[in-house]
Amino acid sequence: MTRRRFLEGAMALALSPSLDLALAAGCRSDEHLVVIPAGPFWMGSDAKERDYAYRIGGEAARRNRWFDVELPRRRVRLSAYAIDRYLVTNVEYQRFIQETGHRAPSITEDEYQRQGYLVHAYQKVKPYLWRDGRHPDGRGKHPVVLVSLADALAYAHWRSDKEKQRYRLPIEAEWEKAARGTDGRYFPWGNRWRLGLANAEYRVGDTTEVGSYRGGVSPFGCLDMAGNVFEWTSSEFPDGKAVMKGGGSWDDQPGICRAAARHGRAKDARHILFGFRCVCEMDAATIR
């Protein structure tokens, strides 16, 4: 299979207008997957939450009013689905690279400069670059980064074929429910930021192995849903940019690390702060 055909299949599978394609249900909670039961949850933010977020969110967030793009707080009902307990790691992504010949996570300095939002100098990117199809030494259990939306979709397509189940990227609502539970809490653990529960605020200055912050587990049992890296979703902003979730990254202030926070990025963006996890569909659940 050529890389072009593989990517076309991945995009068609994950971005189809109808997300109720049949697949034998076999997803269940285990070491790697968490089942999120059907039912309503509180999604988005209200003025009270955003005011708190701006107080703890840093000067750039306040100056640019980053949190004003968040969806209004409301009850949303979803069908049951399963989601990865952990972010996709370098080791897992390397198996995909080796079996498909897909491009490895990397970016040249020119490509990086053209993206236009240089949060970090290219020198900071170099430790994350893959070489000869292999992830950097010592980072096997770290989340894979420097992947675009298409790269993440291609991985989900490959995983679907390999495990004979339907994997895709989460929509924004699915990611948010898995991160905050049903009661509308700001963070996976509650409504107030707590030190030591997430890899954030540049305290480590790097990604960490997935699942390292056990105290920050979400109500459903997902890890790293605040801090470490932002995560791709299949949802879009009106301007066509992809909605990124993930509760911020290792480089972000606490206000950005809330479950309701959302950020728009070009779909071809590759950055050391961007990773992903997958959803496994259950009983051809229809997302409303």
Where is each model-derived feature located?
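Functional-site microenvironments in short loops/helix caps that host divalent-cation chemistry
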Residues: 35-36, 42, 46-65, 103, ...
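C-terminal segment of N-terminal export signals and the immediately downstream linker at the start
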Residues: 1, 17-28, 32
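Short, structured beta-strand segments at or near domain termini in extracellular proteins/domains
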Residues: 272-286
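Well-ordered beta-strand positions in beta-sheet-rich domains
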Residues: 33, 40, 73-75, 80
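Acidic-aromatic/histidine active-site loop/patch
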Residues: 89
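N-terminal secretory signal peptides and thylakoid transit peptides that target proteins
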Residues: 1-14
